[in-house]
């Protein structure tokens, strides 16, 4: 529970949602334009792809959707970083590239780590500890959320000082999130179970026999 919630938050989702107006300002959008575009576009894409995930989860399966979405998140974060790193070279195209990359990031998150985090912790625990396990998962989610949001601009500031360049500082922060997404893929291979079409009783029986998550 804590593991999937760690990766759900540490790929930077809430920094993108909370600070999207500031991120768009850094990319060259101005004032109200940045705030409106960020809020509307991010919100609409998030809602639409979260709805889509409801149809995909039982068609594609949890593990496969996790790997598809997290891979997309990783590449999107790399592209967001590149938009900032090469903003001088891209010029006006920076805005288009950044918006496209951010919306891809939101879309991939909304079909994978977003809903899967909550779904998996509701399925994998034995009945006698399900309430406790879900509570720990929820606590971990908000704890990691607070930590990531609190450190976001500190990371940017630290990288700014390291490189002496604001664009590279912002880019490096998103690349850190991309590295965490890569680690999530490795972690997911071993610890994300496939519960599609498996009853809660069979899941509990699997754990009782000492089965591994990836073998479910």
Residue ranges and their predicted role:
Residues 1-216:
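Alpha-helical transmembrane bundle of multi-pass membrane proteins
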């Amino acid at each position: 529970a804590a593991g999937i919630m760690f990766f759900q938050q540490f790929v930077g989702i809430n920094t993108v949602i909370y600070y999207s107006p500031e991120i768009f300002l850094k990319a060259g959008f101005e004032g109200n334009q940045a705030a409106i575009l960020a809020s509307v576009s991010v919100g609409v894409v998030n809602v639409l792809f979260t709805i889509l995930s409801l149809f995909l989860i039982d068609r594609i399966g949890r593990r496969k959707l996790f790997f598809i979405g997290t891979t997309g998140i990783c590449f999107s974060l790399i592209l967001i970083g590149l938009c900032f790193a090469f903003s001088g070279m891209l010029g006006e195209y920076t805005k288009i590239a950044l918006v496209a990359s951010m919306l891809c990031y939101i879309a991939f998150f909304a079909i994978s780590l977003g809903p899967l985090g909550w779904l998996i912790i509701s399925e994998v625990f034995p009945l006698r500890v399900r309430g406790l396990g879900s509570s720990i998962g929820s606590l971990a989610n908000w704890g990691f959320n607070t930590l990531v949001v609190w450190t976001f601009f500190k990371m940017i500031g630290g990288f700014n000082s390291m490189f002496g360049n604001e664009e590279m500082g912002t880019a490096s922060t998103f690349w850190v999130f991309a590295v965490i997404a890569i680690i999530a893929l490795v972690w997911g291979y071993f610890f994300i179970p496939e519960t599609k079409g498996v009853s809660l009783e069979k899941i509990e029986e699997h754990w009782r026999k000492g089965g591994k998550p990836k073998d479910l």
